[in-house]
């Protein structure tokens, strides 16, 4: 597995933070780092495999990667990211207690993926630009300013994720997408889902297409197929059982959609035929 080292990314040994744009981010094999990073998805879509678990990401997704996490990107479509790198929560010269602003693992669950709305994303871009512009200055006041801006970023992300609520259509769509990640295997009535999240059906279709490039049903099918591929790789369950477990009522229809999405059949994935592409 590829290991990325801080010496190759941070401008100097004194720099607490480094900014790495990926415009766009191509598919990238599994790797980990000796530093931490916050991945901010600007726009586009892709699959983020995080510690073996697949997540569909799009504009507004924020992922917190620790130095022992492993991750990779697959099936990227104009996926544009900004990576905010930092050595560790305890490696800042002027800040302490940052762990309280970061997601915390509890009972074996690490809430690595957050979502923010477009308004917050604009504010995030401004803070990232401030840090990027001062990257080369190693004077104490400049380092302190960058650390303060980094803390502002954490506060903004945490506040936005906690109080987003149902304030506007953008926020409601974010909550809907998070709900689909957990309920992908259920039978979904888009009329009912739209009503639950206080969206008109037309708004749901339009906004999901803008965020992901996919219609609601195609987005749901992709979620199901991604989860199914993970089970094919990591369990011994039959193709039929996996199809039903992931929300498909017909295994033949599942196999057709699977090949169309990944260019491999479920059986070929089970046999590891795609291993060279992982």
Curated annotation (Swiss-Prot):
Subcellular location: Cytoplasm
Subunit note: Binds DNA as a dimer.
PROSITE patterns recorded: HTH_ARAC_FAMILY_1 (PS00041), HTH_ARAC_FAMILY_2 (PS01124)
Gene3D superfamilies in the record: Homeodomain-like, Jelly Rolls
Family annotation (CDD domains): cupin_RhaR_RhaS-like_N
Signal sequence extent: none
HTH araC/xylS-type domain sequence ranges: 174-272
Keyword set includes Amino-acid biosynthesis: no
One MF annotation (Gene Ontology) recorded for this entry: DNA-binding transcription factor activity
Protein name as annotated: HTH-type transcriptional activator RhaS
Domain of life of the organism encoding this protein: Bacteria
Any single GO BP term: rhamnose metabolic process
Record key words, sorted: Activator, Cytoplasm, DNA-binding, Repeat, Rhamnose metabolism, Transcription, Transcription regulation
InterPro entries referenced in this protein's UniProt entry, alphabetically: AraC-bd, AraC_XylS_family_regulators, Homeodomain-like_sf, HTH-like, HTH_AraC, HTH_AraC-typ_CS, RhaR_RhaS-like_N, RmlC-like_jellyroll
Protein role: Activates expression of the rhaBAD and rhaT operons.
Any one of the GO CC terms: cytoplasm
Source taxonomy: Bacteria, Pseudomonadati, Pseudomonadota, Gammaproteobacteria, Enterobacterales
Organism the protein comes from: Enterobacter sp. (strain 638)
């Amino acid at each position: 597995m590829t290991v990325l080292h801080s010496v190759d990314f941070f401008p100097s040994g004194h720099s607490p933070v480094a900014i790495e744009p990926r415009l766009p981010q191509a598919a990238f094999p599994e790797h980990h780092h000796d530093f931490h990073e916050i991945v901010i998805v600007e726009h586009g879509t892709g699959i983020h495999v995080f510690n073996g678990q697949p997540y569909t990401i799009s504009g507004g997704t924020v992922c917190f990667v620790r130095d022992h996490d492993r991750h990779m990107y697959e099936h990227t479509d104009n996926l544009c990211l900004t990576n905010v790198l930092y050595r560790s929560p305890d490696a800042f010269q002027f800040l302490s207690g940052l762990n309280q602003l970061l997601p915390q693992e509890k009972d074996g669950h690490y809430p690595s993926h957050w979502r923010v709305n477009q308004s917050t994303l604009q504010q995030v871009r401004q803070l990232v630009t401030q840090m990027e512009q001062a990257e080369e200055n190693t004077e104490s006041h400049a380092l302190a300013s960058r650390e303060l801006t980094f803390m502002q970023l954490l506060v903004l992300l945490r506040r936005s994720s906690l109080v987003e609520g149902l304030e506007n259509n953008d926020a409601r769509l974010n909550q809907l997408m998070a709900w689909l990640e957990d309920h992908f295997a259920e039978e979904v009535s888009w009329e009912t889902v739209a009503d639950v999240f206080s969206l008109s059906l037309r708004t749901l279709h339009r906004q999901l297409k803008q965020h992901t490039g996919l219609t609601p049903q195609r987005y749901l099918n992709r979620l199901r197929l991604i989860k199914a591929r993970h089970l094919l790789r990591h369990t011994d369950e039959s193709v039929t059982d996996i199809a039903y477990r992931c929300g498909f009522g017909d295994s033949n229809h599942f196999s057709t959609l699977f090949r169309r999405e990944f260019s491999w059949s479920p059986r070929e994935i089970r046999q590891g035929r795609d291993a060279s592409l992982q």
